[in-house]
Amino acid sequence: MSDWNPSLYLHFAAERSRPAVELLARVPLENIKYVADLGCGPGNSTALLHQRWPAARITGIDSSPAMIAEARSALPDCQFVEADIRNWQPEQALDLIFANASLQWLPDHYELFPHLVSLLNPQGVLAVQMPDNWLEPTHVLMREVAWEQNYPDRGREPLAGVHAYYDILSEAGCEVDIWRTTYYHQMPSHQAIIDWVTATGLRPWLQDLTESEQQLFLTRYHQMLEEQYPLQENEQILLAFPRLFIVARRTE
């Protein structure tokens, strides 16, 4: 599991794209020239940006070669760069930085977010959506299984929190719109939940394990999911998935 799997990621493309659509709807910009899609993945969010601003120069950034290859194939009119978000520098100041479900993987948001704001033009916008599920059973159980099986903690850190992000971005010279939404995804089985998180949150826990260790981990994880996520009357499972949204407009 050394690289991301675009096919597995896109298995839930509609569910993953919905937050990007809702984030984009709150971006208060019309005619813009320069856009960056940070953590663009296979290009599903980039496609939304290109649809809204077809004349803009849109650059997708991702550290995964597989994701970049998929995005280039899907969107030949956009530019894609394989790079670390923290180190990438645009050729010119940006009108919009869009980051859908990517910045949660990076540390030290107290430095990262002001840095991203510094890359914007005056009145430019930083639009961010991050999964806020560190305390959800899906992610708590990852840590519990790892502890049971004596594996090191590979999970990401929790988000800084609504009040912290508001202060960080206000102090960086932005007007801030921030909100939190919990989606309830209908899942056909507990295995479907595993398929979902295997493409994202579960990757760090599995990537250094042998095949047999991965199987032991997933078997125990499946057992725990069954205990935490009961079936509905129609035998579907409701997967709660909170997400944090931020639209920050530079005023300085």
UniProtKB/Swiss-Prot annotation:
It is found in: Cytoplasm. It catalyses: trans-aconitate + S-adenosyl-L-methionine = (E)-3-(methoxycarbonyl)pent-2-enedioate + S-adenosyl-L-homocysteine. Catalyzes the S-adenosylmethionine monomethyl esterification of trans-aconitate. This is Trans-aconitate 2-methyltransferase. Its EC number is 2.1.1.144. One of its GO terms (cellular component) is cytoplasm. Gene3D superfamilies: S-adenosyl-L-methionine-dependent methyltransferases, Vaccinia Virus protein VP39. One of its GO terms (biological process) is methylation. It comes from Escherichia coli (strain SE11). The keyword Disulfide bond does not apply. Signal peptide: none annotated. Its main location: cytoplasm. The lineage of its organism: Bacteria, Pseudomonadati, Pseudomonadota, Gammaproteobacteria, Enterobacterales. InterPro entries: Methyltransf_25, SAM-dependent_MTases_sf, Trans-aconitate_MeTrfase, Trans_acon_MeTrfase_C. NCBIfam families: PRK01683.1. Belongs to the methyltransferase superfamily. Tam family. Keywords: Cytoplasm, Methyltransferase, S-adenosyl-L-methionine, Transferase. GO terms for molecular function: trans-aconitate 2-methyltransferase activity.
